[in-house]
């Protein structure tokens, strides 16, 4: 990729999608800090420039190509092998991770699916109370019994879950007024049969492999193609080379029976398969939860 091509890509992304600028520093000296506008992303291919970007607290993506094999490019968690890796979502993720902003996963007509922040603690505790007899509908584990314990759990979850695994449980928000409606997202799924699972009151459903084809929109670039040394940790291989996840949701009572789940689950599944690279997505539902079973079978 030469500088002209890089600048064309930058202009396209900046004008159509972003409120920040992408700066390409390919095989050249690092410019003066004053040359960078606010909200910059840096793409470079030299170790020394990666270190300078870090020194100035700028989010940086490494670019590996045939002419820089001697560079380690280990100074950043972000790496691409070609310009196809520069998808809008990926660039937005780099920006949000660096500046510790909640990442918007997807939107629908009525809902925004976005990473949680500590501002949602009161609503998450309300959801916990409404589901005190239904642990699968809770965000916090059952051993979080005090406000302080719940607050600490949420802080640690936000700090570690999204950045390390690349996915997690997200908040569902109203598009018009940002009202918190509930939670939905992914958790690791262990496909292990034990006496407990055989006697469980829950049923497991494998989400249709073709469900994502029902969702319009351009296919996103799989992040595993442009992740760095964390790739093997983010994308472990399960038995039979499957990368599985469990999807779940829980909606506050006042927003139930309004089609929220049926609206947010298809685009969320599409995101899981097309961007996160899940080969199998399952959900666990109580046997007497007829509405959720019917939704899972759609």
Predicted regions and their residues:
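Asp-based, Mg2+/Mn2+-dependent phosphohydrolase catalytic module
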Residues: 1-106
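GNAT-family acyltransferases
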Residues: 3, 17, 81-254, 270-271, ...
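Short hydrophobic clusters on alpha-helical segments that form packing/core surfaces
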Residues: 29-32, 268, 272
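Short, high-confidence coil segments that cap the C-terminus of an alpha-helix
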Residues: 37-39, 167, 278
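Conserved catalytic-core motifs of GNAT/GCN5-like acyltransferases
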Residues: 64-68, 191, 284
